[in-house]
Amino acid sequence: MEAREVEEMRRSRLLTLGGIGYTAVIALAALVLVMGALGLVLKVAAAAGALPSEVAKVANALPGLKASVDANPAAGSLSSVSVST
């Protein structure tokens, strides 16, 4: 092989790896945004008076997600909402 062909192959591999890395970063950023939005929705639902067990049940029905809500419905307070994959 000529040096030029080797250089073209090397450049092609780097572009492919860069594209894969770029796609992975975008996918991770999208996942973070979705998780944040889901957490916000759960907080609003819990603050609106939904029972914590109902909110967690709906969130846990989504594939790949686990949610927990710590709240005191009698006092109308919301301690925390957490969502994880």
From Swiss-Prot:
Indicate the transmembrane segments per the record.
22-42
Its cellular-component GO annotations read: membrane
Protein's membrane topology: Single-pass membrane protein
Q: Which residues form the signal peptide?
A: 1-18
Disulfide feature: none
Q: Does the keyword Transmembrane apply?
A: yes
Where is it localised?
Cell outer membrane
- Judging by the UniProt lineage, the source's domain of life is Archaea
UniProt keyword terms in alphabetical order: Cell outer membrane, Membrane, Signal, Transmembrane, Transmembrane helix
Instruction: Mention any additional remark.
Output: Ignicoccus hospitalis is unique in having an energized outer membrane while ATP synthesis occurs within the periplasmic space.
Described by its record, this protein's role is as follows: The most abundant protein of the outer membrane, it forms a pore through it.
Describe the protein's quaternary organization and the partners it interacts with: Forms extremely stable complexes with apparent masses of 150, 50, 45 and 38 kDa. Found in a ring-shaped complex of 7 nm diameter with a 2 nm channel through the middle. Complete denaturation requires temperatures over 110 degrees Celsius.
Q: What is this protein called?
A: Major outer membrane protein 1
Name the source organism. Ignicoccus hospitalis (strain KIN4/I / DSM 18386 / JCM 14125)
Gene symbol here is ihomp1
